[in-house]
UniProtKB/Swiss-Prot annotation:
Gene Ontology molecular-function annotations: cytokine activity; frizzled binding
Protein name: Protein Wnt-5b
UniProt keyword annotations, A-Z: Developmental protein, Disulfide bond, Extracellular matrix, Glycoprotein, Lipoprotein, Secreted, Signal, Wnt signaling pathway
Domain of life of the organism encoding this protein: Eukaryota
Biological processes per GO annotation: animal organ development; canonical Wnt signaling pathway; cell fate commitment; muscle cell differentiation; neuron differentiation; positive regulation of convergent extension involved in gastrulation; positive regulation of non-canonical Wnt signaling pathway
């Protein structure tokens, strides 16, 4: 199959998305405060209403945190919403894993903003959160296409890689990363594209920052997807292989974006209304890099204004010199030490046939908590 025919098929896959995007652009409005977020879809299960029940509310009217444009996309693609929620949940969990040993640990709060007021600051942490959330949606939608869960997409139609050996078959049902990336762009970016802040304003800079980091998250999933193959043959001889495009494990995506977080570029709004480097001595960021416009707040102490939850009560590692160490995690305030019993399986033995029997052991361990 030549590249032209592949491109035509891809274009057909996303034509409905482009039409929806044009519809949303014509109905944009000024949004001053993002008190709610679509991330909240990851905190509560999404259940499609039973249409035959008298008085049942439409699905999209039940979902909080959606912007006007996202709600319209919800109406057009209701079967996608469960997977958008799954993607948000995946992103939140990965964020919490990657930052589990940092002062800011991606904690959620009990409202539809999900992460609280700290997201109103255009910091490195905010940049990572936007990127990993967008990546989660690409991941979930791409896999749902492959599994036949969505009405507007199916298996990947990516062209055969040129470096694939000739005697290997190409055509297994792969993850549709192309569709997942396109749909995630239309849905996740809808909120930002509805805004109409004055060009060059601080609010406009924040919108550009969000859009850039959303794209960086999508690019991470797209670029890390790779070829997977399965052997066929008598007695596992692997005389034939069938290959397809497969998503990378999401942990790899999280680790990749964490590296981008550590090297994120500090930006400011320029005279032409575009983001530019704060320090021109550095190379400009690529679409895969994260960008931020504000310094991170003090995460050591609880602060209602910035949304920082502080590190009081956080566990720390007494012997570590890293960010999880008690000296850094507790910000010099000191720590309390106490002993607890840790219960775990031990002395496991295999019995024929066929089960494993273990004993339960208790060990007294020291734990340290920041004051």
């Amino acid at each position: 199959m030549d590249n032209r025919s592949v491109q035509r098929r891809r274009t057909g896959d996303v034509r409905h998305l482009l039409l929806a995007a044009a519809f949303l652009t014509c109905n944009s409005q000024l949004l001053l405060v993002d008190a709610n977020s679509w991330w909240s879809l990851g905190l509560t299960p999404i259940q499609r209403p039973e249409m035959y029940i008298i008085g049942a509310q439409p699905l999209c009217s039940q979902l909080s945190g959606l912007s006007q444009g996202q709600r319209k996309l919800c109406q057009l693609y209701q079967d996608h919403m469960t997977y958008i929620g799954d993607g948000a949940k995946t992103g939140i969990k990965e964020c919490q894993y990657q930052f589990r040993q940092r002062r800011w640990n991606c904690s959620t709060v009990d409202n539809t903003s999900v992460f609280g007021r700290v997201m109103q600051i255009g910091s490195r942490e905010t940049a990572f959160t936007y990127a990993i959330s967008a990546a989660g949606v690409v991941n979930a939608i791409s896999r749902a296409c492959r599994e036949g869960e969505l009405s507007t997409c199916g298996c990947s139609r990516t062209a055969r890689p040129r470096d694939l050996p000739r005697d290997w078959l190409w055509g297994g049902c792969g993850d549709n990363v192309y569709y997942g990336k396109r749909f995630a762009q239309e849905f996740v970016d809808a909120r930002e594209r509805e805004k109409n802040y004055p060009r060059g304003s601080r609010e406009h800079a924040r919108t550009l920052m969000n859009l850039h980091n959303n794209e960086a998250g999508r690019q991470a999933v797209y670029n890390l997807a790779d070829v997977a193959c399965k052997c066929h043959g008598v007695s596992g001889s692997c005389s034939l292989k069938t290959c397809w495009l497969q998503l990378a494990d999401f942990r790899r995506v999280g680790e990749f974006l964490k590296e981008k977080y550590d090297s994120a570029a500090a930006m400011r709004i320029g005279r032409k209304g575009r983001l530019e480097l704060l320090d021109k001595r550095f190379n400009p960021p690529t679409p895969e890099d994260l960008v931020y416009i504000d310094l991170s707040p003090d995460y050591c102490h609880r602060n209602e204004t910035t949304g920082s939850l502080g590190t009081q009560g956080r566990f720390c590692n007494k012997t570590s010199e890293g960010m999880d160490g008690c000296e850094l995690m507790c910000c010099g305030r000191g720590y309390d030490q106490f002993r607890v019993y840790k219960h775990e399986r031990c002395h496991c033995k295999f019995h024929w046939c066929c089960y494993v029997k273990c004993k339960r052991c208790s060990t007294l361990v020291d734990q340290f908590v920041c004051k």
